[in-house]
Amino acid sequence: MLTRLKATFRYFNNVVPFRLGPALITTAVLVTLLLLPVPEGLKPKAWGLVAIFLTTIVAIILKVMPIGVMAVMAIVVLSLSQVTSTSSKGAIADALTAFDSPLIWLIVVAILISRGLKKTGLGSRIGLIFISLIGKRTVGIGYGLAVCELVLAPFTPSNTARGGGIVHPVMKSIANAFDSDPAKGTEGKVGTYLAMVNYHANPITSAMFLTATAPNPLVVDYIAKATSQSLHLTWTSWALCMLLPGLLCLLVMPLVIYVLAPPQIHATPNAVAYARAELAKMGPMSPKELVMSGTFALLLLLWADVPAMVFGTSFVLDPTVVAFVGLFLLIITGTIDWDDVLSEKSAWDTLVWFGALIMLAEQLNKQGVITWFSEAMKGAIVASGIGWGATATILVLAFVLSHYLFASTTAHISAMMLAFLTVGVHLIPPEYVAPFMLMMAAGSAIMMTLTHYATGTSPIIFGSGYVTMGTWWRVGFVMCVVELLIFAVVGSLWWKMLGFW
């Protein structure tokens, strides 16, 4: 009997287009969650939404089918179950709400723009220049990418534009110069390591400057509200507070990733000579390379809000608008064509799966799940009677780790941060409130490390295929812990020296 069951399982596993074992596990998770009693304080439909969200995450982790298919599954199940509406028309409208998100289109267009770097050869040229300067060791190239992030961060309010639209194309070009390409199965040479450094520099620099990511001003506003305006961070005070722990994180991060996701190529002693020889063969920049570099420079200036600094706030442009301007310029100048846009599969794949995850996260908030979670956390801490140190630790960890439920830092901060800050103000002695607030501010960026959908930058880099999901989540969790420890220990001492507590 057992032999027959095994044979039947193997047969179906070979004929169905999905992995049967993971599919059965995912189905069991969904059924189990739906059979559990609805937690007090949640409506049945809200609990059904939680079940759909968690099942989708499990299906993605177990790789039942490609992530885009799992996203479509989530849309179908949510629409049929009508957990967000009283009709299928309302449910499908809810399921598709995130696809008009400017953030998603910023990601898609940034991927499309990066195609121009490859097509024109400018990306290869940049990669070779980079290698000719610092290409003797792979870890040195990693530090170079981190420095690029650091230099751009104060002037680029969109961390997605910075990490995914500016630095990532350079990283891909460097990887290609070493013949490290996911399409060839050679991503492990240097690509996986450099992609991880490319990504993990992004949350660190986002924490270091008020203008390095969009939700930081909201964090400042919430801190001021929670402390009744007694702690109001300016651009300068934010940068000063985050300077030392942030720089230490940037110093440590490439080394930690070097251990967690080591490149197959460690030393590249001949790379500098090779790069210089290849640059000599390429000759001067072609007209299309000049157009591409000019467009790239324009994007950087507009993403850094330079026109607004010079001419006033009426010249502020949304990062997504800027991205579309860049894409349009590349198309009308013939630098890329419409077939290039249509054939960039990773952009459209990202549109589907990231849109679905953002939609699920937004619906969790709308259905009151996030508020319920926040209130339950507050109640549990108050009832436990634990000391203020443990309270602060639990609040920071709960806030950061709950980002597994979110596909947007702005949505997470908007939904939960003020509630957590308010609890902290009530339960932590006044003289220790400031370091708690600064830890929460740092944590609001550090939480980006956790998943491949944590912020707009992550799906761009993950979608390029250099890093598996298992590696991404493993490295992400370790880096989250390391960075939190650095900010908690070094940051707290630094803030004491600065007189914040």
Protein language model features and the residues they cover:
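Membrane-core helix-loop-helix motifs of multi-pass transport proteins
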Residues: 178-266, 457-490, 501
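Hydrophobic transmembrane alpha-helices of multi-pass small-molecule transporters
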Residues: 1-106, 226, 230, 236-375, ...
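Hydrophobic alpha-helical membrane-insertion segments
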Residues: 60, 197-210, 353-363, 426, ...
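Alpha-helical transmembrane segments of multi-pass membrane proteins
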Residues: 107, 139-153, 179-206, 232-241, ...
